[in-house]
Amino acid sequence: MTSYMLGIDIGTTSTKAVLFSEKGDVIQKESIGYALYTPDISTAEQNPDEIFQAVIQSTAKIMQQHPDKQPSFISFSSAMHSVIAMDENDKPLTSCITWADNRSEGWAHKIKEEMNGHNVYKRTGTPIHPMAPLSKITWIVNEHPEIAVKAKKYIGIKEYIFKKLFDQYVVDYSLASAMGMMNLKTLAWDEEALAIAGITPDHLSKLVPTTAIFHHCNPELAAMMGIDPQTPFVIGASDGVLSNLGVNAIKKGEIAVTIGTSGAIRPIIDKPQTDEKGRIFCYALTENHWVIGGPVNNGGIVLRWIRDEFASSEIETAKRLGIDPYDVLTKIAERVRPGADGLLFHPYLAGERAPLWNPDVPGSFFGLTMSHKKEHMIRAALEGVIYNLYTVFLALTECMDGPVARIQATGGFARSDVWRQMMADIFESEVVVPESYESSCLGACILGLYATGKIDSFDVVSDMIGSTHRHAPKEESAKEYRKLMPLFINLSRALENEYTQIANYQRSLSSKK
């Protein structure tokens, strides 16, 4: 008899629910989107109840069509770094403040420079940055005392969902390790981090393993979802670490690279590790599996900007012919040889997280001459996104025990043959595209199989996930990229002061509008 499992991924723009067989075959998937409220350049919030309804409705839609396929468990993936302040009556005092919200930038800088931030990072694994709940809660406590005085708890979006489902405040080690407030070695809240934020452990949820199982879901909500209230719920982990599981990047020497709107690069190691230079994160998958890596802000958004600003006429033609606009862009880029004839693009259109951790860093072209044309700029932009990921990769290799054998590539960019080959050439490594497209949902379910005792290791993953494309590096292209990479890296280091100056100038213009 076939058994089924349901993976739910609470993302920044939508919640996805996927019903799988226990062999990993997709039975059905549903996605429900919601708004990200960005009234100004620094604010990025969501309505937590819209997200909660998306969880209920996406599950209900699947179960309405498959009432005979009750899942043996439901397991969760979630975006990281969100903060919701809750009052004494368990009602939200704030919206869901997302990872993309930069209002705590001033406090992140203060924590890093004046409050022993680097040592806190080394213990907690989360770089000191406005994305981190440590920075966000510190900002609320200091800048919004009218909220802080009423706040009983500071929680993330998955905690909000579980509070409604099970009437408990619980947070898994994975999401907690992305808050900047959990000691990675003791798996307890870090006293110094909490002191910086001005809170106590009572302000935070109870820490539990990513394999923790919850029963007795609220009967009314279970009925709305179309599931048995006794269905086991596995709390799961964060979307990033579960994506590694879902794309089969879990063995030594394997790295997962994702480029969607933003991007990330992540291997798994067996014990927590941080970086003396503060360039990378370290987040929990289980107590014996840790994901190190770096998130980048500038992935597909760079391609979208290039599409809109450099290729509007070509895109209009593509639309009329029914061709994917992004295929047109990569075809244009193919007209130019690797290295874009010496044109470099630093792709920092949205500031940058890893490896620079500088929200002020802007994008720029370098090496532009009269001989460069539009196609050079398009190719340079595509290469710039991969160059930037490669700089994060260099930091990671210092923390890895052994060479990289294979890159598992996912996200929208993995659909592009040109971009995949570019990555193989720049990284000088084999690039494989796994069959799994809903990697975080599948990763959540694989963790659920492990939590419920249906598997005793993650080795089964390779049987669930095939591959669709493979690319080996081309030496001729790799040789050109080897010459250009040091330039790309050295420029971003050399211009640090100028980045701040131009950002201050741009902010002064905004304030005059």
UniProtKB/Swiss-Prot annotation:
InterPro entries attached to this UniProt entry: ATPase_NBD (IPR043129), Carb_kinase_FGGY (IPR000577), Carb_kinase_FGGY_CS (IPR018483), FGGY_C (IPR018485), FGGY_Carb_Kinase (IPR050406), FGGY_N (IPR018484), Gluconate_kinase (IPR006002)
Top-level EC class as recorded in UniProt: transferase
Example of a GO biological process term: D-gluconate metabolic process
Entry binding sites for ATP: 16, 261, 300, 412-416
GO molecular function, a single term: ATP binding
The keyword Nucleotide-binding belongs to this UniProt entry's keyword annotation: yes
Keywords: ATP-binding, Gluconate utilization, Kinase, Nucleotide-binding, Transferase
EC number(s) reported in the record: 2.7.1.12
PANTHER family xref list: GLUCONOKINASE, SUGAR KINASE
UniProt protein name: Gluconokinase
